[in-house]
Amino acid sequence: MFTNNKNGAIIILKVIDWRVKNMQRTYLCIDLKTFYASVECVERHLDPFNTNLVVADLSRGKGAICLAISPKMKMLGVKNRCRIYEIPPTVKYIVALPRMKKYIEYSANIYAIYLKYFAKEDIHVYSIDEAFMDATNYLKMYNMTAVELAQTIIKDIFHIIIVSNYFEY
């Protein structure tokens, strides 16, 4: 389920129920949408849903692989992990040089938001842009459904990470 595309949220929400030995556990999976490209858009004060941007190293030539493309590029039919020469010549776009340190900083800041809601032992980081949270013991504490809790976290990420960077000059 995509959440709040109209305000530029960059998160895919997945709520997973997992039954273990007759005990139901509820996990949230937050997968940051086209993370590298979205970070590059935010850093440039651009909306990832309305910006044509690819993350690639052009010094490697037209055969360079795009590490990420913005959601807008995907809507135009451009495939993630394509090569530069595979992007239709009619599509105008911004090329962002990969900045792994910057992506790690954003990921760490987002992890800090997760820690506002969950103990670290209930957060299972899968990759730089995806984490699973065992929400089982927190739903009652926060008096929320899994979807409500996930949406609350997403709003926090949007306001703390995205909005603060977007309006920072």
Residue ranges: model-predicted function:
Residues 4-5:
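Intrinsic-disorder-associated, low-complexity terminal segments enriched in Asp/Asn/His/Tyr and depleted
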Residues 10-139, 145-147, 151-161, 166-169:
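Residues that scaffold, gate, or flank divalent-cation-dependent active/transport sites
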